[in-house]
Amino acid sequence: MEQKWWHNAVIYQVYPKSFKDSNGDGIGDLKGITSKLDYLEKLGITAIWLSPVYKSPMDDNGYDISDYEDIASIFGTMEDMEELIAEGQKRKIKIIMDLVVNHTSDEHAWFIEAREHPDSPKRDFYIWRDEPNGIISAFSGSAWEFDEASGQYYLHNFSKKQPDLNWENEELRHHIYDMMNFWIDKGIGGFRMDVIDMIGKIPDQEIISNGPMLHPYLKEMNQATFRDKDLLTVGETWGATPEIAKQYSNPKNQELSMVFQFEHIGLQYQPGQPKWHYAKELDVPKLKEIFTKWQTELGEEEGWNSLFWNNHDLPRIVSTWGDDGNYRVKSAKALAILLHLMKGTPYIYQGEEIGMTNYPFKTLEDVEDIESINYAHEALEKGVSLEVIMDQIRHIGRDNARTPMQWNDEAEAGFTTGRPWLAVNPNYKEINVEAALADPDSIFYTYQALIALRKEYPWLVTADYELVDAADKVFAYKRVEGEQAYLVVVNLSSQEQELPLVNGVEEVLIANTKVEQVLESGKLAPWDAFCVKLA
Protein backbone atom coordinates (compact mmCIF):
# COMPACT_ATOMS: atom_id res chain seq x y z
CA MET A 1 0.00 0.00 0.00
CA GLU A 2 1.27 3.44 -0.91
CA GLN A 3 1.42 5.40 2.36
CA LYS A 4 -0.56 8.64 2.44
CA TRP A 5 -0.53 11.30 5.14
CA TRP A 6 -4.02 10.34 6.31
CA HIS A 7 -3.03 6.75 7.10
CA ASN A 8 -1.52 7.81 10.43
CA ALA A 9 -3.56 11.00 10.81
CA VAL A 10 -6.12 11.79 13.49
CA ILE A 11 -8.95 14.12 12.44
CA TYR A 12 -10.84 16.43 14.82
CA GLN A 13 -14.35 17.51 13.89
CA VAL A 14 -15.31 21.08 14.72
CA TYR A 15 -18.98 22.07 14.74
CA PRO A 16 -18.36 25.81 14.32
CA LYS A 17 -21.60 27.07 15.84
CA SER A 18 -20.73 25.40 19.15
CA PHE A 19 -16.93 25.52 19.36
CA LYS A 20 -15.84 29.04 20.41
CA ASP A 21 -17.51 32.43 20.09
CA SER A 22 -15.10 35.34 19.59
CA ASN A 23 -17.53 38.26 19.47
CA GLY A 24 -20.13 37.62 22.17
CA ASP A 25 -23.12 36.96 19.91
CA GLY A 26 -23.59 33.47 21.36
CA ILE A 27 -22.60 31.68 18.15
CA GLY A 28 -19.22 30.04 17.58
CA ASP A 29 -17.21 31.46 14.68
CA LEU A 30 -14.05 31.15 12.60
CA LYS A 31 -11.99 33.53 14.73
CA GLY A 32 -13.00 31.45 17.73
CA ILE A 33 -11.66 28.29 16.07
CA THR A 34 -8.41 30.04 15.12
CA SER A 35 -8.00 31.17 18.75
CA LYS A 36 -8.06 27.52 19.87
CA LEU A 37 -5.58 26.09 17.34
CA ASP A 38 -2.85 25.96 20.01
CA TYR A 39 -5.10 23.71 22.10
CA LEU A 40 -5.68 21.40 19.12
CA GLU A 41 -1.95 21.39 18.38
CA LYS A 42 -1.33 20.30 21.99
CA LEU A 43 -3.81 17.45 21.53
CA GLY A 44 -1.77 16.41 18.48
CA ILE A 45 -4.37 16.23 15.71
CA THR A 46 -3.44 16.27 12.01
CA ALA A 47 -6.51 17.96 10.55
CA ILE A 48 -9.79 19.66 11.39
CA TRP A 49 -12.98 18.52 9.67
CA LEU A 50 -14.95 21.76 9.64
CA SER A 51 -18.73 21.42 9.52
CA PRO A 52 -20.25 23.86 6.99
CA VAL A 53 -19.43 27.56 7.31
CA TYR A 54 -20.77 28.56 3.87
CA LYS A 55 -23.44 31.22 3.43
CA SER A 56 -26.73 29.72 4.62
CA PRO A 57 -30.14 30.63 6.04
CA MET A 58 -29.34 28.04 8.76
CA ASP A 59 -32.50 25.98 8.41
CA ASP A 60 -30.35 22.90 9.10
CA ASN A 61 -27.38 24.53 10.84
CA GLY A 62 -25.43 25.22 7.65
CA TYR A 63 -26.20 22.02 5.74
CA ASP A 64 -28.53 24.20 3.63
CA ILE A 65 -26.10 26.24 1.53
CA SER A 66 -27.11 29.39 -0.36
CA ASP A 67 -23.60 30.24 -1.67
CA TYR A 68 -20.75 27.72 -1.78
CA GLU A 69 -18.10 30.41 -2.34
CA ASP A 70 -19.02 32.74 0.51
CA ILE A 71 -18.96 32.50 4.31
CA ALA A 72 -22.04 32.80 6.55
CA SER A 73 -21.85 36.15 8.31
CA ILE A 74 -22.52 34.51 11.70
CA PHE A 75 -19.19 32.68 11.29
CA GLY A 76 -17.19 35.62 9.93
CA THR A 77 -15.69 36.52 6.56
CA MET A 78 -13.66 34.90 3.80
CA GLU A 79 -10.62 36.66 5.31
CA ASP A 80 -11.33 34.85 8.61
CA MET A 81 -11.50 31.56 6.70
CA GLU A 82 -8.21 32.24 4.93
CA GLU A 83 -6.63 33.14 8.29
CA LEU A 84 -7.82 29.83 9.79
CA ILE A 85 -6.28 27.89 6.87
CA ALA A 86 -2.99 29.83 7.15
CA GLU A 87 -2.74 29.56 10.95
CA GLY A 88 -3.55 25.86 10.71
CA GLN A 89 -0.74 25.37 8.19
CA LYS A 90 1.72 27.02 10.61
CA ARG A 91 0.83 24.30 13.13
CA LYS A 92 0.72 21.50 10.53
CA ILE A 93 -3.08 21.25 10.95
CA LYS A 94 -5.01 20.86 7.70
CA ILE A 95 -8.59 22.09 7.19
CA ILE A 96 -11.04 19.61 5.67
CA MET A 97 -14.20 21.25 4.32
CA ASP A 98 -17.67 19.75 4.58
CA LEU A 99 -18.95 19.30 1.02
CA VAL A 100 -22.77 19.34 0.85
CA VAL A 101 -23.71 18.70 -2.78
CA ASN A 102 -26.73 16.40 -2.56
CA HIS A 103 -28.85 19.53 -2.04
CA THR A 104 -28.67 23.30 -1.67
CA SER A 105 -30.75 25.81 0.24
CA ASP A 106 -33.96 26.97 -1.42
CA GLU A 107 -32.35 30.42 -1.11
CA HIS A 108 -29.45 29.49 -3.43
CA ALA A 109 -29.42 31.62 -6.61
CA TRP A 110 -29.79 28.45 -8.71
CA PHE A 111 -33.03 27.44 -6.99
CA ILE A 112 -34.45 30.97 -6.97
CA GLU A 113 -33.94 31.14 -10.74
CA ALA A 114 -35.26 27.60 -11.23
CA ARG A 115 -38.40 28.43 -9.27
CA GLU A 116 -39.09 31.81 -10.86
CA HIS A 117 -38.22 30.84 -14.44
CA PRO A 118 -39.37 27.30 -15.30
CA ASP A 119 -37.81 27.66 -18.77
CA SER A 120 -34.37 28.52 -17.32
CA PRO A 121 -31.49 26.00 -17.70
CA LYS A 122 -31.24 26.15 -13.87
CA ARG A 123 -34.64 24.44 -13.63
CA ASP A 124 -32.93 21.17 -14.51
CA PHE A 125 -30.39 21.66 -11.67
CA TYR A 126 -33.15 20.34 -9.40
CA ILE A 127 -35.65 17.47 -9.52
CA TRP A 128 -39.21 18.44 -10.50
CA ARG A 129 -42.20 16.17 -11.08
CA ASP A 130 -45.90 16.68 -11.83
CA GLU A 131 -46.91 14.16 -9.18
CA PRO A 132 -45.17 12.97 -5.98
CA ASN A 133 -44.32 9.32 -5.30
CA GLY A 134 -43.66 7.54 -2.02
CA ILE A 135 -40.21 8.92 -1.11
CA ILE A 136 -40.11 9.95 2.57
CA SER A 137 -37.89 12.77 3.85
CA ALA A 138 -35.18 11.95 6.40
CA PHE A 139 -36.77 14.73 8.47
CA SER A 140 -40.27 13.12 8.41
CA GLY A 141 -43.15 13.44 5.93
CA SER A 142 -43.13 13.36 2.13
CA ALA A 143 -39.90 14.30 0.34
CA TRP A 144 -41.92 16.22 -2.28
CA GLU A 145 -43.00 19.86 -1.87
CA PHE A 146 -45.59 21.49 -4.11
CA ASP A 147 -44.49 24.72 -5.79
CA GLU A 148 -47.64 26.71 -6.53
CA ALA A 149 -45.98 29.07 -9.00
CA SER A 150 -45.07 26.31 -11.46
CA GLY A 151 -47.60 23.66 -10.46
CA GLN A 152 -44.87 21.03 -9.95
CA TYR A 153 -43.32 19.28 -6.98
CA TYR A 154 -39.60 19.42 -6.14
CA LEU A 155 -37.68 16.69 -4.29
CA HIS A 156 -36.13 17.35 -0.87
CA ASN A 157 -34.73 14.34 0.95
CA PHE A 158 -34.17 16.56 3.99
CA SER A 159 -35.97 19.82 4.90
CA LYS A 160 -38.27 21.44 2.34
CA LYS A 161 -35.72 24.27 2.39
CA GLN A 162 -33.08 21.79 1.11
CA PRO A 163 -34.06 20.91 -2.49
CA ASP A 164 -32.11 17.98 -3.97
CA LEU A 165 -29.72 18.68 -6.83
CA ASN A 166 -30.09 16.80 -10.13
CA TRP A 167 -26.70 15.22 -10.70
CA GLU A 168 -27.79 13.99 -14.12
CA ASN A 169 -27.28 17.58 -15.32
CA GLU A 170 -23.72 17.89 -16.66
CA GLU A 171 -23.62 21.69 -16.35
CA LEU A 172 -24.52 21.40 -12.66
CA ARG A 173 -21.77 18.84 -12.04
CA HIS A 174 -19.15 21.11 -13.57
CA HIS A 175 -20.32 24.06 -11.45
CA ILE A 176 -19.76 21.83 -8.40
CA TYR A 177 -16.28 20.79 -9.55
CA ASP A 178 -15.36 24.44 -10.17
CA MET A 179 -16.49 25.26 -6.63
CA MET A 180 -14.38 22.42 -5.20
CA ASN A 181 -11.34 23.72 -7.07
CA PHE A 182 -12.03 27.20 -5.65
CA TRP A 183 -11.51 25.75 -2.15
CA ILE A 184 -8.61 23.50 -3.14
CA ASP A 185 -6.84 26.60 -4.48
CA LYS A 186 -7.28 28.22 -1.06
CA GLY A 187 -5.15 25.47 0.48
CA ILE A 188 -7.61 23.15 2.18
CA GLY A 189 -6.62 19.56 3.01
CA GLY A 190 -9.64 17.75 1.63
CA PHE A 191 -13.39 17.21 1.79
CA ARG A 192 -15.84 15.34 3.99
CA MET A 193 -18.74 14.59 1.64
CA ASP A 194 -22.19 14.83 3.19
CA VAL A 195 -24.65 12.01 2.24
CA ILE A 196 -22.57 11.48 -0.91
CA ASP A 197 -24.17 8.08 -1.53
CA MET A 198 -27.38 9.90 -2.53
CA ILE A 199 -26.09 11.82 -5.57
CA GLY A 200 -26.76 8.92 -7.96
CA LYS A 201 -30.45 8.66 -7.00
CA ILE A 202 -33.20 7.61 -9.43
CA PRO A 203 -36.27 9.30 -7.91
CA ASP A 204 -38.81 7.72 -10.28
CA GLN A 205 -37.75 4.27 -9.08
CA GLU A 206 -37.51 5.51 -5.46
CA ILE A 207 -33.79 4.66 -5.47
CA ILE A 208 -32.20 7.22 -3.14
CA SER A 209 -28.82 5.72 -2.13
CA ASN A 210 -26.21 3.82 -4.15
CA GLY A 211 -27.81 4.55 -7.51
CA PRO A 212 -26.12 3.19 -10.66
CA MET A 213 -24.43 6.50 -11.57
CA LEU A 214 -22.96 7.17 -8.11
CA HIS A 215 -19.50 5.77 -8.83
CA PRO A 216 -19.20 7.23 -12.36
CA TYR A 217 -19.99 10.65 -10.86
CA LEU A 218 -17.34 10.20 -8.16
CA LYS A 219 -14.74 9.13 -10.72
CA GLU A 220 -15.58 12.21 -12.79
CA MET A 221 -15.33 14.40 -9.67
CA ASN A 222 -11.96 12.86 -8.79
CA GLN A 223 -10.57 13.57 -12.27
CA ALA A 224 -11.93 17.13 -12.33
CA THR A 225 -10.76 18.17 -8.87
CA PHE A 226 -8.50 16.33 -6.43
CA ARG A 227 -6.94 13.61 -8.63
CA ASP A 228 -3.34 14.89 -8.47
CA LYS A 229 -3.67 16.62 -5.10
CA ASP A 230 -2.68 14.98 -1.82
CA LEU A 231 -6.12 15.47 -0.29
CA LEU A 232 -8.18 13.42 2.16
CA THR A 233 -11.66 12.69 0.83
CA VAL A 234 -14.18 10.87 3.02
CA GLY A 235 -17.76 10.07 2.07
CA GLU A 236 -20.71 9.76 4.43
CA THR A 237 -22.32 6.44 3.41
CA TRP A 238 -24.97 5.18 5.83
CA GLY A 239 -25.75 2.00 3.91
CA ALA A 240 -22.21 0.88 3.03
CA THR A 241 -21.00 -2.71 3.37
CA PRO A 242 -17.28 -3.56 3.12
CA GLU A 243 -17.82 -4.48 -0.54
CA ILE A 244 -19.48 -1.12 -1.24
CA ALA A 245 -16.79 0.70 0.76
CA LYS A 246 -14.11 -0.87 -1.43
CA GLN A 247 -15.77 0.63 -4.51
CA TYR A 248 -15.29 4.08 -3.01
CA SER A 249 -11.90 3.68 -1.37
CA ASN A 250 -9.89 1.21 -3.46
CA PRO A 251 -7.08 3.45 -4.78
CA LYS A 252 -7.34 1.74 -8.19
CA ASN A 253 -10.90 3.06 -8.57
CA GLN A 254 -9.78 6.68 -8.19
CA GLU A 255 -12.76 7.83 -6.16
CA LEU A 256 -12.31 8.65 -2.43
CA SER A 257 -9.74 8.05 0.32
CA MET A 258 -12.24 6.40 2.68
CA VAL A 259 -15.87 6.38 3.78
CA PHE A 260 -17.78 6.69 7.02
CA GLN A 261 -19.76 3.49 7.55
CA PHE A 262 -22.39 3.43 10.27
CA GLU A 263 -23.03 -0.25 10.86
CA HIS A 264 -21.71 -0.09 14.44
CA ILE A 265 -23.75 3.07 15.08
CA GLY A 266 -26.86 1.07 14.15
CA LEU A 267 -26.44 -0.78 17.45
CA GLN A 268 -27.65 2.39 19.19
CA TYR A 269 -31.15 1.58 17.90
CA GLN A 270 -33.49 -1.35 18.50
CA PRO A 271 -33.21 -3.90 15.66
CA GLY A 272 -35.74 -3.27 12.91
CA GLN A 273 -37.08 -0.13 14.61
CA PRO A 274 -36.88 3.53 13.52
CA LYS A 275 -34.05 5.68 14.87
CA TRP A 276 -35.96 7.01 17.89
CA HIS A 277 -36.39 3.55 19.43
CA TYR A 278 -32.99 3.42 21.10
CA ALA A 279 -31.35 0.25 22.38
CA LYS A 280 -31.27 0.04 26.18
CA GLU A 281 -27.74 -1.39 26.26
CA LEU A 282 -24.85 -2.15 23.95
CA ASP A 283 -24.79 -5.59 22.31
CA VAL A 284 -21.03 -6.12 22.77
CA PRO A 285 -20.81 -9.45 20.87
CA LYS A 286 -22.49 -7.77 17.90
CA LEU A 287 -20.11 -4.79 18.17
CA LYS A 288 -17.16 -7.21 18.07
CA GLU A 289 -18.64 -8.93 15.03
CA ILE A 290 -19.18 -5.65 13.14
CA PHE A 291 -15.76 -4.15 13.86
CA THR A 292 -14.03 -7.44 13.07
CA LYS A 293 -15.83 -7.64 9.73
CA TRP A 294 -14.73 -4.13 8.76
CA GLN A 295 -11.18 -4.57 10.08
CA THR A 296 -10.62 -7.81 8.17
CA GLU A 297 -12.69 -7.39 4.99
CA LEU A 298 -11.61 -3.86 4.11
CA GLY A 299 -8.04 -4.92 3.28
CA GLU A 300 -5.36 -2.25 3.19
CA GLU A 301 -4.79 -2.62 -0.54
CA GLU A 302 -8.50 -2.30 -1.37
CA GLY A 303 -9.77 0.31 1.02
CA TRP A 304 -9.37 2.13 4.30
CA ASN A 305 -11.44 2.42 7.49
CA SER A 306 -12.66 5.54 9.22
CA LEU A 307 -12.81 5.04 12.98
CA PHE A 308 -15.33 7.09 14.95
CA TRP A 309 -17.79 7.07 17.82
CA ASN A 310 -19.20 10.58 17.59
CA ASN A 311 -20.18 13.31 15.16
CA HIS A 312 -22.57 16.28 15.05
CA ASP A 313 -25.56 13.98 14.34
CA LEU A 314 -24.97 11.42 17.08
CA PRO A 315 -25.38 11.38 20.87
CA ARG A 316 -22.27 11.46 23.05
CA ILE A 317 -20.59 8.04 23.18
CA VAL A 318 -19.74 8.19 26.89
CA SER A 319 -23.47 8.60 27.61
CA THR A 320 -24.60 6.06 25.01
CA TRP A 321 -22.19 3.16 25.48
CA GLY A 322 -20.01 4.30 28.34
CA ASP A 323 -21.10 4.99 31.91
CA ASP A 324 -21.41 8.75 32.31
CA GLY A 325 -22.24 8.40 36.00
CA ASN A 326 -19.87 6.35 38.14
CA TYR A 327 -17.28 5.60 35.45
CA ARG A 328 -17.38 8.60 33.11
CA VAL A 329 -13.61 9.16 32.99
CA LYS A 330 -12.63 5.51 32.91
CA SER A 331 -15.25 4.46 30.35
CA ALA A 332 -14.37 7.40 28.07
CA LYS A 333 -10.73 6.28 28.13
CA ALA A 334 -11.73 2.66 27.51
CA LEU A 335 -13.80 3.54 24.45
CA ALA A 336 -10.94 5.67 23.10
CA ILE A 337 -8.35 2.91 23.59
CA LEU A 338 -10.62 0.36 21.90
CA LEU A 339 -11.15 2.50 18.80
CA HIS A 340 -7.83 4.27 18.28
CA LEU A 341 -5.69 1.13 18.21
CA MET A 342 -7.64 -0.38 15.32
CA LYS A 343 -6.63 -0.06 11.68
CA GLY A 344 -7.91 3.12 10.02
CA THR A 345 -8.06 6.87 10.50
CA PRO A 346 -9.58 7.95 13.84
CA TYR A 347 -11.97 10.90 14.05
CA ILE A 348 -12.55 12.79 17.31
CA TYR A 349 -15.63 14.99 17.74
CA GLN A 350 -15.20 18.21 19.72
CA GLY A 351 -15.55 17.61 23.45
CA GLU A 352 -15.08 13.85 23.13
CA GLU A 353 -11.50 14.29 24.35
CA ILE A 354 -12.75 15.72 27.68
CA GLY A 355 -15.66 13.30 28.07
CA MET A 356 -18.56 15.67 27.36
CA THR A 357 -21.94 14.03 27.94
CA ASN A 358 -25.50 14.14 26.64
CA TYR A 359 -27.66 17.07 27.77
CA PRO A 360 -30.53 16.66 30.29
CA PHE A 361 -33.27 18.14 28.06
CA LYS A 362 -36.42 18.78 30.12
CA THR A 363 -38.89 20.35 27.65
CA LEU A 364 -39.28 20.71 23.89
CA GLU A 365 -38.43 24.40 24.33
CA ASP A 366 -34.86 23.30 25.18
CA VAL A 367 -34.50 21.65 21.75
CA GLU A 368 -33.16 23.40 18.63
CA ASP A 369 -32.61 20.48 16.23
CA ILE A 370 -35.07 20.43 13.31
CA GLU A 371 -35.02 16.62 13.11
CA SER A 372 -35.92 16.23 16.80
CA ILE A 373 -38.63 18.91 16.66
CA ASN A 374 -40.24 17.41 13.54
CA TYR A 375 -40.18 13.96 15.12
CA ALA A 376 -41.71 15.26 18.36
CA HIS A 377 -44.66 16.89 16.60
CA GLU A 378 -45.26 13.80 14.46
CA ALA A 379 -45.05 11.50 17.49
CA LEU A 380 -47.40 13.69 19.55
CA GLU A 381 -49.97 13.51 16.75
CA LYS A 382 -49.72 9.70 16.88
CA GLY A 383 -50.40 9.72 20.60
CA VAL A 384 -46.86 9.16 21.92
CA SER A 385 -46.53 10.82 25.32
CA LEU A 386 -44.29 13.87 25.74
CA GLU A 387 -42.47 12.00 28.53
CA VAL A 388 -41.47 9.22 26.12
CA ILE A 389 -40.48 11.72 23.40
CA MET A 390 -38.24 13.72 25.76
CA ASP A 391 -36.59 10.48 26.93
CA GLN A 392 -35.88 9.61 23.28
CA ILE A 393 -34.45 13.07 22.56
CA ARG A 394 -32.22 12.87 25.65
CA HIS A 395 -30.81 9.58 24.35
CA ILE A 396 -30.76 10.07 20.56
CA GLY A 397 -31.34 13.75 19.68
CA ARG A 398 -28.70 15.53 17.61
CA ASP A 399 -28.52 18.50 20.02
CA ASN A 400 -26.64 16.23 22.46
CA ALA A 401 -23.57 16.69 20.27
CA ARG A 402 -24.21 20.37 19.62
CA THR A 403 -24.19 21.92 23.07
CA PRO A 404 -21.35 24.45 23.35
CA MET A 405 -17.78 23.30 23.93
CA GLN A 406 -16.90 23.48 27.62
CA TRP A 407 -13.66 25.48 27.93
CA ASN A 408 -13.61 26.39 31.63
CA ASP A 409 -15.79 26.69 34.74
CA GLU A 410 -16.69 30.34 34.19
CA ALA A 411 -20.04 31.64 32.89
CA GLU A 412 -21.31 29.72 29.82
CA ALA A 413 -18.26 27.43 30.13
CA GLY A 414 -16.07 30.10 28.53
CA PHE A 415 -17.77 29.49 25.17
CA THR A 416 -19.25 33.00 24.90
CA THR A 417 -19.57 36.26 26.81
CA GLY A 418 -23.18 36.46 25.55
CA ARG A 419 -26.17 34.13 25.60
CA PRO A 420 -25.30 30.86 23.79
CA TRP A 421 -27.48 29.76 20.85
CA LEU A 422 -27.98 26.40 22.63
CA ALA A 423 -27.74 25.94 26.39
CA VAL A 424 -24.42 24.84 27.88
CA ASN A 425 -24.52 21.47 29.66
CA PRO A 426 -24.93 22.18 33.40
CA ASN A 427 -22.02 19.82 34.19
CA TYR A 428 -19.48 22.26 32.71
CA LYS A 429 -18.11 23.19 36.17
CA GLU A 430 -16.70 19.66 36.41
CA ILE A 431 -16.20 18.80 32.73
CA ASN A 432 -14.13 21.42 30.89
CA VAL A 433 -10.86 21.84 29.00
CA GLU A 434 -9.13 23.87 31.71
CA ALA A 435 -9.78 21.18 34.32
CA ALA A 436 -8.70 18.45 31.89
CA LEU A 437 -5.40 20.15 31.09
CA ALA A 438 -4.67 20.61 34.81
CA ASP A 439 -5.23 16.91 35.60
CA PRO A 440 -2.46 14.60 34.31
CA ASP A 441 -4.87 11.65 34.64
CA SER A 442 -7.62 13.24 32.53
CA ILE A 443 -9.31 11.84 29.43
CA PHE A 444 -7.53 14.53 27.38
CA TYR A 445 -4.10 13.03 28.05
CA THR A 446 -5.29 9.54 27.09
CA TYR A 447 -6.37 10.95 23.71
CA GLN A 448 -3.08 12.83 23.41
CA ALA A 449 -1.16 9.61 24.15
CA LEU A 450 -3.19 7.60 21.62
CA ILE A 451 -2.50 10.20 18.91
CA ALA A 452 1.22 10.13 19.78
CA LEU A 453 1.26 6.31 19.55
CA ARG A 454 -0.18 6.48 16.03
CA LYS A 455 2.62 8.81 14.96
CA GLU A 456 5.31 6.73 16.68
CA TYR A 457 4.39 3.16 15.70
CA PRO A 458 4.04 2.21 12.01
CA TRP A 459 2.31 -1.07 12.99
CA LEU A 460 -0.80 0.91 13.94
CA VAL A 461 -1.19 1.64 10.23
CA THR A 462 -0.05 -1.65 8.74
CA ALA A 463 -0.48 -4.56 11.21
CA ASP A 464 -3.22 -7.14 10.68
CA TYR A 465 -6.19 -7.34 13.03
CA GLU A 466 -7.24 -10.55 14.82
CA LEU A 467 -10.20 -10.89 17.20
CA VAL A 468 -9.30 -12.62 20.49
CA ASP A 469 -11.79 -14.91 22.23
CA ALA A 470 -13.06 -13.27 25.43
CA ALA A 471 -16.09 -12.91 27.70
CA ASP A 472 -19.17 -11.40 26.07
CA LYS A 473 -18.61 -7.93 27.55
CA VAL A 474 -14.86 -7.93 26.87
CA PHE A 475 -13.54 -6.76 23.50
CA ALA A 476 -10.03 -8.10 22.91
CA TYR A 477 -8.03 -8.05 19.70
CA LYS A 478 -4.47 -8.36 18.46
CA ARG A 479 -2.58 -6.33 15.90
CA VAL A 480 -0.05 -8.67 14.32
CA GLU A 481 2.90 -7.79 12.11
CA GLY A 482 5.25 -10.63 11.24
CA GLU A 483 6.41 -12.22 14.50
CA GLN A 484 5.33 -9.28 16.63
CA ALA A 485 1.88 -8.98 18.25
CA TYR A 486 0.16 -6.28 20.28
CA LEU A 487 -2.86 -7.09 22.44
CA VAL A 488 -5.74 -4.70 23.20
CA VAL A 489 -8.20 -5.67 25.97
CA VAL A 490 -11.23 -3.56 26.96
CA ASN A 491 -13.98 -4.32 29.48
CA LEU A 492 -17.07 -2.65 27.99
CA SER A 493 -19.13 -2.90 31.16
CA SER A 494 -19.52 -1.54 34.69
CA GLN A 495 -19.04 -5.05 36.13
CA GLU A 496 -15.94 -7.14 36.79
CA GLN A 497 -15.10 -9.53 33.94
CA GLU A 498 -12.73 -12.45 33.34
CA LEU A 499 -9.45 -11.53 31.67
CA PRO A 500 -8.76 -13.49 28.47
CA LEU A 501 -5.56 -15.55 28.49
CA VAL A 502 -2.50 -13.32 28.11
CA ASN A 503 0.91 -14.87 27.44
CA GLY A 504 4.15 -12.95 27.97
CA VAL A 505 3.78 -9.20 28.26
CA GLU A 506 6.89 -7.29 27.19
CA GLU A 507 5.67 -3.70 27.52
CA VAL A 508 2.54 -1.70 28.40
CA LEU A 509 1.86 0.89 25.68
CA ILE A 510 -1.25 2.52 27.16
CA ALA A 511 -3.76 1.72 29.91
CA ASN A 512 -6.42 3.21 32.15
CA THR A 513 -5.62 0.69 34.89
CA LYS A 514 -2.67 -1.01 36.63
CA VAL A 515 -1.98 -3.79 34.12
CA GLU A 516 0.30 -5.81 36.43
CA GLN A 517 -2.51 -6.14 38.98
CA VAL A 518 -4.98 -7.15 36.26
CA LEU A 519 -2.62 -9.84 34.96
CA GLU A 520 -2.00 -11.16 38.49
CA SER A 521 -5.69 -11.31 39.43
CA GLY A 522 -7.01 -12.52 36.07
CA LYS A 523 -9.90 -10.09 36.54
CA LEU A 524 -10.83 -6.92 34.67
CA ALA A 525 -12.34 -4.23 36.86
CA PRO A 526 -15.18 -2.16 35.32
CA TRP A 527 -14.01 -0.37 32.15
CA ASP A 528 -10.41 -1.60 32.42
CA ALA A 529 -8.58 -1.10 29.11
CA PHE A 530 -5.00 -1.57 28.00
CA CYS A 531 -2.67 -2.30 25.11
CA VAL A 532 0.46 -4.40 25.60
CA LYS A 533 3.30 -5.57 23.42
CA LEU A 534 3.53 -9.35 23.65
CA ALA A 535 6.89 -11.07 24.10
What are these model-predicted stretches?
Residues 56-57, 103-105, 198-203, 240-245, ...:
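Flexible loop/turn segments at secondary-structure boundaries
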Residues 5-6, 225, 232, 239, ...:
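Loop/helix patches that line or flank the sugar-binding groove of alpha-linked glycan CAZymes
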Residues 2-177, 181, 185, 196-251, ...:
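Acidic/aromatic-lined carbohydrate-recognition and catalytic surfaces
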Residues 496-514:
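Beta-strand-rich binding/interaction modules
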Residues 202-203, 304-325:
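Active-site clefts of carbohydrate-active enzymes
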Residues 189, 292-313:
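Aromatic-lined glycan-binding groove of carbohydrate-active enzymes
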Residues 519-535:
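C-terminal beta-strand-rich structural cap/linker in extracellular carbohydrate-active enzymes
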